[in-house]
């Protein structure tokens, strides 16, 4: 079974090779588009620092993650027809280079194994949202999202509002999300502070 743990060792090898040829960038504001597949489909983007959100068509939120992250690693071989965007959630730095050059460098430096690990992990993450949400009722979707959020480190959780994240990820109405969160807090199942998730004590399987 593929691990959902980010393959940092493999990222390090790829970054060491690619960074020498990349054009640096820095974003200092939130909600700036770093990568858009309909504009940047011939480039590979490597995020070195910062928090980013990954969104699909119609601004559907797939998830939020901290650097490091690579987008467009395989675009030099096959174009991605699904429109994705990477959005900065604060200060963000990294670099980009032509996707075809990325493939050439991977070939020259025999980094196919590392590239495969990264792409396998990325595909698993992209699938995870659909696995957690499709075919489940509103509470089950909220529950799954809370469980995914508690796996974030404390710094990331302190930056992301629970209600907005759940609403954008699931498309469940804010009123329903607020009602469920209030009930879970009242029952002592979750702990929140200023709208941020602090802890999960236990989540009932049904609401």
UniProtKB/Swiss-Prot annotation:
SUPFAM superfamilies: cAMP-binding domain-like. Disruption phenotype: Deletion mutants display increased resistance to oxidative stress and increased catalase activity. The keyword Transmembrane does not apply. Signal peptide: none annotated. Keywords: Stress response. Residues 163-182 bind DNA. GO terms for biological process: response to oxidative stress. HAMAP family: IprA. NCBIfam families: PRK11832.1. Involved in oxidative stress resistance. Belongs to the IprA family. This is Inhibitor of hydrogen peroxide resistance. It comes from Escherichia coli (strain K12). The lineage of its organism: Bacteria, Pseudomonadati, Pseudomonadota, Gammaproteobacteria, Enterobacterales.
């Amino acid at each position: 079974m593929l691990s959902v743990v980010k393959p940092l060792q493999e990222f390090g090898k790829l970054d060491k090779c690619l960074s020498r040829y990349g054009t640096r960038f820095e974003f200092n504001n939130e909600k700036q588009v770093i990568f858009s597949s309909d504009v940047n489909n011939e480039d590979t983007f490597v995020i070195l620092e910062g928090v980013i959100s990954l969104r699909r068509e119609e601004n559907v939120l797939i998830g939020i993650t901290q650097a490091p992250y690579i987008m467009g690693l395989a675009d030099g071989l096959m174009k991605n027809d699904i429109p994705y965007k990477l959005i900065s959630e604060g200060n963000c730095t990294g670099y980009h280079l032509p996707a075809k050059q990325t493939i050439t460098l991977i070939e020259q430096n025999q980094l196919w194994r590392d590239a495969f690990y990264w792409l396998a992990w990325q595909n698993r993450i992209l699938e995870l949202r659909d696995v957690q949400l499709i075919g489940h009722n509103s509470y089950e979707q909220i529950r799954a999202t809370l469980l995914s959020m508690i796996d974030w480190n404390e710094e990331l959780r302190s930056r992301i509002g629970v209600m907005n994240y759940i609403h954008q990820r699931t498309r469940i109405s804010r009123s329903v999300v607020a009602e469920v969160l209030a009930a879970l807090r009242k029952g002592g199942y979750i702990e929140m502070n200023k709208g941020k998730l602090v802890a999960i004590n236990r989540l009932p399987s049904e609401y």
